[in-house]
Amino acid sequence: MKPIIYIKYGELTLKGKNRAQFIKVLVHNIKQMLLEYHELVYQVGYDNLKIINLEKYNLQQVINDLQQVYGIAFICVAYQVNKEINEIQLACNKLVNNTDQTFKIEARRNDKSFIYDSMQIKQICATYLLQNQPTLKVDVHHPQLLINIEIKHDCAIVYGHKIPGAKGLPVGINGKALVLLSGGIDSPVASRLIMKRGISVDFITFITPPHTSQKALDKTIALAKQITLNNHLTKANLYVCNFTKLQEEIAHISKESYRITLMRRYFMRIAKRLAIDIKAGALVTGEALGQVASQTLNSMQTISSVLNDFLVLRPLITYDKQEIISLAKQFNTYELSILPYDDSCSLFAPKNPTTNPNVQTAMKLEQESLVLDAIYELVFTKEITKINLSSK
């Protein structure tokens, strides 16, 4: 009797007519995550996925990889047996690693034609365990081991501990967004949270050589790879925009306090145009309300006004910094994010950036330059490089 992996789907089971598409996307994502395990066999069910042929692989490593995939409610090590009560009993016995513990059995029949009802299945299997392992004890309220028996139409599944999945929705089921990715803590976390809601991502980052170094770009590439788990979670590209020419022109505006505001307005303009080109339906930022000068209500309104009606998603808008750091550590992006390489925002930030900008002043300052729009057009058409994260 060999173990299998038994996966229960997450939120996608609530989606009615779209169920088949949700399952298709989830199974595809699982296969992408487990691409290196060449001999695995997948059996797709209405509310579950079974993975068999695991003998050659490290079972715990497969489970660890599966825990990263959005759309999974829980994962179990299980036994798939014939619908014979003696085989079900043996499978229950396989799950008992410690004979000095309490247990409870739950049973469910999808196949109502099975000879025993749920209560009888529980009684027969519990009696078998107690006879074969006398030190076991039944505890129906707080058992140390909960054994689950599911009688399917074609087999019986027996499993114990439920390992939590990442939950959420399968990445890609809700379209694509373009993430404005910096080398900081926030935007990588925002990326993962938006992926959890079923959105695939591409990234855009802004560099200002020679003011920013190659190491700073390498850090951002490493972050993008970690966010996507080397493109196993989603097939993403990183677009690198050389912003130096625009940055140097913005540095000459008459109101230094507006420098970051104008810079971010051009970030948004460039990101929107790129998003439309790559068929992304929204932009994603790591903004958290009130965290820095450019993230007040007035600042965000002034900056995003250049987008007209184009959608901006801000998954971190209500989070405080410690919550974001905690998630960054969970996603293994934190240590990369705190590497000491400056990005374009930090290098060009004024001493006292405005926290209360307005659209009219921002537009007036942009109009001070006779060449700003021409430089913007040049940067968008000539200064964006695409990096395929699967190959670099």
Swiss-Prot record:
Protein name (Swiss-Prot/TrEMBL): Probable tRNA sulfurtransferase
Give the enzyme's EC designation. Answer: 2.8.1.4
Point out the gene that encodes the protein: thiI
Among InterPro entries, the record links this protein to:
Rossmann-like_a/b/a_fold (IPR014729), ThiI_AANH (IPR020536), ThiI_fer (IPR054173), ThiI_N (IPR049961), THUMP_dom (IPR004114), THUMP_ThiI (IPR049962), tRNA_STrfase (IPR003720), tRNA_sulfurtransferase_ThiI (IPR050102)
Q: What does this protein do?
A: Catalyzes the ATP-dependent transfer of a sulfur to tRNA to produce 4-thiouridine in position 8 of tRNAs, which functions as a near-UV photosensor. Also catalyzes the transfer of sulfur to the sulfur carrier protein ThiS, forming ThiS-thiocarboxylate. This is a step in the synthesis of thiazole, in the thiamine biosynthesis pathway. The sulfur is donated as persulfide by IscS.
Task: Answer yes or no on keyword Nucleotide-binding.
Answer: yes
* Reaction it catalyzes: [ThiI sulfur-carrier protein]-S-sulfanyl-L-cysteine + a uridine in tRNA + 2 reduced [2Fe-2S]-[ferredoxin] + ATP + H(+) = [ThiI sulfur-carrier protein]-L-cysteine + a 4-thiouridine in tRNA + 2 oxidized [2Fe-2S]-[ferredoxin] + AMP + diphosphate; [ThiS sulfur-carrier protein]-C-terminal Gly-Gly-AMP + S-sulfanyl-L-cysteinyl-[cysteine desulfurase] + AH2 = [ThiS sulfur-carrier protein]-C-terminal-Gly-aminoethanethioate + L-cysteinyl-[cysteine desulfurase] + A + AMP + 2 H(+)
Q: What is the lineage of its organism?
A: Bacteria, Bacillati, Mycoplasmatota, Mycoplasmoidales, Mycoplasmoidaceae
Q: Where ATP is bound, by residue?
A: L180, L181, T205, F206, R264, G286, Q295
* PROSITE patterns (alphabetical): THUMP
